[in-house]
Amino acid sequence: MMAVWPTVGMAKRNSKQRIDPLIEESPALLELIAPARSRDSGNTILAKEFRGGVLVMTGANSAVGLRSMPVRYLFLDEVDGYPLDVDGEGDAISLAEARTRTFARRKIFLVSTPTISGASAVEREYEASDQRRYFVPCPHCSHRQWLRFEQLR
């Protein structure tokens, strides 16, 4: 698995502020991933090893971090903040997606706050997709609905 943020610094911050607390508060994950304090634990700021896999975290500003490792599951966060060209090797989204090409059943998840319409990477990717939406049942009547921000409380 690979998770990509706009910069390596953001990847480190998200690892410390989101991923580590998630592991520490989840008994199932805590059982799978050795504490960072353990010698040779496989648990570093930018990599979390577990039986059967590894979560590698990197920044979209690092061509080195976006190459050489095949990944079946790819999470791209805040893609509108990605550089248009990474070290002369191309755009970060394409470089990251190239890591998944060897897997027939790959999963790629792009997330971002859209920026300028017409220039937004997440808007472009959504327009190029099949534009599926996730529907959830209403807790009152069970009607399946697409969640919108204005519906959240």
Q: What are the roles of these predicted feature ranges?
A:
Residues 1-153:
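Phosphate/NTP-binding elements of NTP-utilizing enzymes
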